[in-house]
From Swiss-Prot:
Protein name stated in the entry: Small ribosomal subunit protein eS19
PROSITE patterns according to UniProt: RIBOSOMAL_S19E (PS00628)
SMART domains: Ribosomal_S19e
GO annotation, cellular component aspect: cytosolic small ribosomal subunit
Database matches in Gene3D superfamilies: Winged helix-like DNA-binding domain superfamily/Winged helix DNA-binding domain
Gene name, Swiss-Prot/TrEMBL: RPS19
Record PANTHER family: 40S RIBOSOMAL PROTEIN S19
A single BP term in Gene Ontology: ribosomal small subunit assembly
GO MF annotations in UniProt: RNA binding; structural constituent of ribosome
Keyword field: Ribonucleoprotein, Ribosomal protein
Amino acid sequence: MPGGVTVKDVNQQEFVKAFAAFLKKSGKLKLPEWVDLVKTAPHKELAPYDPDWFYLRAASTARHLYMRGGVGVGAMCKIYGGRKRRGTKPAKFRVCSRGVSRTVLQSLEGIKMVEKDAAGGRRLTSQGQRDLDRIAGQVATAMRKAQ
């Protein structure tokens, strides 16, 4: 970690892209069979266009757990929820697919990055926090070189 850079110190979009690339390159994250067929939420009309959307969702979830531990499946569904357009009726908020959120958290548990919290929800392990900080350091050095 150059200079003690943490996830909170870097641009979140650049970090999520870099961490998703790390997850894909490592090959440890187990992808479900239905990853190319599923819609991510009831308020979406189509499935994601990006074939690596599962890695991006896992990276975003890991970053959120870094910022606030003790978050469960229900809270993750609220975070990734959105506005459902219902035609002439007023729009309403809809949570995302619980199956997708649960599968992402279970996949992160499978690579020992997340563990269940005794108080409820899930939190990062020390290994997971170390990986996130290491990637944040790499993003920070890349951003410094780009300037």
